[in-house]
Every structure is written in C-alpha cells, then in structure tokens.
From Swiss-Prot:
Modified residues (Methionine sulfoxide): M195, M241
Protein keywords: Cholesterol metabolism, Glycoprotein, HDL, Lipid metabolism, Lipid transport, Lipoprotein, Oxidation, Palmitate, Phosphoprotein, Repeat, Secreted, Signal, Steroid metabolism, Sterol metabolism, Transport
Membership in a protein family: Belongs to the apolipoprotein A1/A4/E family.
Higher taxonomy: Eukaryota, Metazoa, Chordata, Craniata, Vertebrata
Biological processes per GO annotation: acylglycerol homeostasis; cholesterol efflux; cholesterol metabolic process; lipoprotein metabolic process; phospholipid efflux; positive regulation of cholesterol efflux; positive regulation of phagocytosis; positive regulation of phospholipid efflux
Tissue specificity as recorded in UniProt: Major protein of plasma HDL, also found in chylomicrons.
Localization terms from the record: Secreted
Stretch list, region 10 X approximate tandem repeats: 69-265
Gene: APOA1
Keyword Glycoprotein: yes
Protein name per Swiss-Prot or TrEMBL: Apolipoprotein A-I
Sequence repeat placement: 69-90, 91-112, 113-123, 124-145, 146-167, 168-189, 190-209, 210-230, 231-241, 242-265
Record's subunit section: Homodimer. Interacts with APOA1BP and CLU. Component of a sperm activating protein complex (SPAP), consisting of APOA1, an immunoglobulin heavy chain, an immunoglobulin light chain and albumin. Interacts with NDRG1. Interacts with SCGB3A2. Interacts with NAXE and YJEFN3.
Length: 265
C-alpha cells in the first residue's frame, strides 16, 4: 500500500503541477508558464556562469595557452548572441506552453476537485494524528523533567543510572509514535486507494476519448514551434559564424605551428 501511495502522489503532482502544493498551503498559485520560465532562466544563467569558469580554466592550461583560442575575448559576443536567441524563442515557447496548459485545463480541474474531496476526508485524521503526536511529546517532556534535575546535580554513578532510565522512556516514545503512524496509515489506506482508482479512471477516460486529439494537437504545436524557431536559429547561427571562424583560424594556426616544430626536429 505504501508503494501505491507513492505512485499516487507522484502521479497527482505530475498532472496537477505545483497547483497541489498551493492548494494545501492556500497560497496564491503561480502560473504554469511563470514556473517554467523562472526555472529555465535560473538554469541557463547557472549554465552560462559555470561554462565561463570552465573556459577560463581551459585557457589557463598548457593546451589552452598553446592553442590560444581566445574564447573569453569572444565571450561577451557569445553571451549576447545566446541572450538574443533566448529573447526570440521566449514568446514561441510561451505560446506553446499556454496552448498546452489551456488544453489540459479540464483534466487538471477534475483532478483538483478530486484532491479537494480527498483533503476534506483525511483532514480529521491528520488533525487527530498531530494532536496525539503533541500529547506524546509533551508527556515525554514531563517524564524527562525530573531526570534533567538529577543530571544537573548528579555524579558519574548517577549518570549511568540516568542512562538506564532514559532508555525505556525513549523506547516508549518511539513505540507510541510508531503506533500512531501505523494507525494513521490504516485510516488513510481506503482514501488512498479511492484516489488511486479515481486517477486510473480519469486516465482511462482520457485515453479512450481525447488521447488521439491531444497527440494531434501536440504534433501541431511542435511543427509550429519548429517553423517559428527557424528565423531565430538562423540569426543565432549567423551571430556565431564570426566567432567560429576565429576559433578555426586559431586552431589551424596552432596545428601549423606544431607541425613546423615537429619538422624542424
């Protein structure tokens, strides 16, 4: 049953996105496109920073000095060209994502409704579990209070006695909490299975009715993406050409120099 619960959770999070997290926390949800855009921006910025470090280390090496590619001299040109590509591609990806987000909205609404019903059913058990957990911890603290006094006033011999007293208390707390966890798992099992069956039913209905339609629309979006991206990628290629030609000349010059040295030996 634990495995089923994990699979269920992952499936719900995958299909509903971060909306589930905002649902539980009652936060204002961030749009799907904003989440993707922020993630990609952070990733690309980190990639550019780390790439510059690698290039700097390479140029400082013996081979880098010998080749003298001067990549860092052209780094600003490369960065600006790459940034321009990002700016040109952003609206294309945004439209693609918004279209897909709109088309899958009905399914996500149904799943969020199922999740709302599940939350209402299991919330009393979660509240009860939290209450019992706090009671057990408070009881443990009360039992520990006199032992703390003994610890402050005790000798080495008393320390050993305290250790013997602490052992059963720790085991008692552990066993109590474990029993509460087991009870909670048992109480939630029917609802977990119910949600799993609902999810399977929703996916089966999607497969029978709209899967072919989604596949066709996804293919259309990808074809449109390729067509719309062609001008931006061509501009990117044109911007890279001077830099690549400079690299080529540097490599050829380094190879020519190495050949001359070998022939002169």
């Amino acid at each position: 049953m634990e495995t089923k619960a994990v699979v269920l959770t992952l499936a719900v999070l995958f299909l509903t996105g971060s909306q589930a997290r905002h649902f539980w926390q009652q936060d204002e949800p961030q749009t799907s496109w904003s989440r993707v855009k922020d993630l990609v921006t952070v990733y690309l910025d980190a990639l550019k920073d780390s790439s510059r470090d690698y290039v700097s280390q390479f140029e400082a090496s013996a081979l880098g000095k010998q080749l003298n590619l001067k990549i860092l001299d052209n780094w600003d040109t490369l960065s600006s060209t790459f940034t321009k590509l990002q700016e040109q591609m952003r609206p294309i990806f945004q439209k693609l994502w918004e279209d897909l987000d709109k088309e899958t909205s009905p399914l996500r609404e149904v799943l969020n409704k199922d999740l709302e019903e599940l939350k209402q059913k299991v919330q009393p058990y979660l509240d009860q579990f939290q209450k019992k957990w706090q009671e057990e911890v408070e009881l443990f603290r009360q039992k520990m209070a006199p032992l703390g006094t003994e610890l402050r006033e005790g000798s080495r011999q008393k320390l050993q006695e305290l250790q013997e007293k602490l052992g059963p208390l720790g085991e008692e707390l552990r066993d109590s909490l474990r029993s509460h966890v087991d009870a909670l798992r048992t109480q939630l099992a029917p609802y977990t299975e119910e949600m799993r069956q609902r999810l399977a039913s929703r996916l089966e209905a999607l497969k029978e009715s709209n899967l072919a339609e989604y596949h066709t629309k996804a293919s259309e979006h990808l074809s449109a993406l390729r067509e719309n991206a062609k001008p931006a990628l061509e501009d990117f290629r044109q911007g890279l050409m001077p830099v690549l030609e400079g690299f080529q000349k540097s490599v050829l010059a380094a190879l020519d120099e190495a050949t001359k040295k070998l022939n002169s030996q």
